[in-house]
């Protein structure tokens, strides 16, 4: 695993200054690689784990348009943490969020608009920008429904604009508030934190199962469950049972079990809805 020596003063900070963003990440950019430290420095220490596991789940589903986050060790001002790294997806392109487009009057605001709004959003992008986002949004909705991403919103759904002013797809990113880990602090694993008791979806409907029904019936996902199991086992061995890398943001046994149970339960729910096949 790669290790980086960093100074917090050199970080590009994204602070939780309003209700739009729940995350608090310290970020550094080295050439075409982004390094991200979890928000544990302030309030949420598990964001690296959720980003990495979420990207593994996406890969296991064959969702290639999701950013792949890999584990790395970040030594920040002498403090060792598990962080994550990813490749820069923008390059020379300009990123514009759906919320930004709505705020400047380019598109309508489709938050909490249900299936009708979902279809209208796809139609509007087709008419105005000659891009079909249906498959992209289906991947987002499926991934979010499995990892229980409670922070998907119009601020982390984006498109890219290239040098020729053509609108193209933006990869799926920002899955850090997922897997229930943002609600699990100080060893609290009570039933109230379980996946079916209090989690709310975004951005079209408050229920993940309702959004999952937006996916076309003829779309089939094959799930590589061993890939997910290997990733969770890696964290269990090296960051729970043992602190192999001597980091401060380790996981507890209850959290590992919680994530295992949650993903298995969510996959079974999706299978019952005949949206994918587990292998």
Regions picked out by a protein language model, each given a short descriptive name:
Residues 1-105:
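Conserved ATP-binding subdomain of kinase catalytic cores across diverse folds
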Residues 10-11, 27, 118-131, 184-188, ...:
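A short, terminal or domain-edge coil/loop segment
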Residues 47, 51, 136, 150-153, ...:
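Active-site-proximal structural scaffolding
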Residues 52-60, 135-143, 261, 265:
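A broad, structural surface signal
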Residues 68-77, 153-163, 276-279:
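Short alpha-helical "patches" and their helix-cap loops
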Residues 117-184:
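Conserved kinase catalytic-core segment
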